């Protein structure tokens, strides 16, 4: 999960889903990882052109300091691998490109495992939080190649949501993995029958439904 900026109060889906799973007493072994840091300027802050070494050992050339969410998520994904998870799901208000591509009504989904993706898709339909799968093709990684590190933290102008997901995929290991980009859906400009105007909590219902489905 990644949250940031003045609207960070709207980003607590993983925490909410874990709380619900505990209250429902779901017979599952769950691990929730919430990488957190304070994003602010300072004498030791990241600068464009810096090269950082991630928890996984991979190096990243920082091309844009505003693409910081994927940096902390990369360490969260690498850390999650220590638990040898049956499945790995991350959720983040990650990219403005998601807003442009999908608008307010679809969660962007990427993944490496067909069974997991289909389970998440079905859970989204049941929960009223629909996902739309986007490609995770290797050709897009050309935009992330770096001369001084294993990869850059941002690509070019095109396909920003895809290159962000591809970046994360390099830290997800070989575990069945799904990434949900909720940047376009975490806020509603109007009241709906099931959501008040404002923060939507999008992804919480989907995650809970997915967890319930795993117990059936």
What are the residue ranges of the model-derived segments?
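A generic structural signal for tightly packed, nonpolar segments enriched in small/aliphatic residues
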Residues: 1-216
């Amino acid at each position: 999960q990644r949250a940031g900026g003045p609207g960070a109060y709207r980003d607590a889906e993983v925490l909410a889903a874990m709380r619900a799973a505990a209250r429902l007493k779901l017979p599952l072994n769950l691990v929730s990882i919430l990488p957190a840091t304070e994003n602010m300027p300072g004498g030791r802050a990241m600068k464009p052109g810096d090269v950082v070494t991630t928890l996984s050992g991979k190096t990243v050339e920082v091309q844009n300091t505003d693409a910081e969410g994927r940096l902390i998520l990369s360490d969260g994904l690498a850390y999650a691998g220590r638990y040898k998870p049956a499945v790995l799901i991350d959720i983040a208000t990650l990219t403005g490109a998601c807003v442009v591509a999908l608008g307010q009504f679809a969660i962007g989904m990427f993944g490496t495992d067909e069974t997991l993706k289909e389970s998440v898709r079905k859970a989204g339909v049941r929960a009223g939080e629909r996902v739309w799968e986007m490609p995770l093709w290797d050709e897009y990684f050309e935009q992330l190649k770096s001369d001084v590190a294993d990869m850059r933290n941002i690509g070019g102008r095109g396909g920003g949501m895809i290159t962000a997901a591809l970046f994360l995929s390099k830290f997800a290991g070989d575990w069945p993995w799904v990434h949900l980009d909720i940047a376009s859906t975490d806020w509603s400009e109007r009241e709906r029958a099931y959501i008040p105007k404002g923060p939507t909590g999008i992804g919480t219902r989907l995650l809970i439904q997915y967890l319930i489905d795993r117990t059936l």
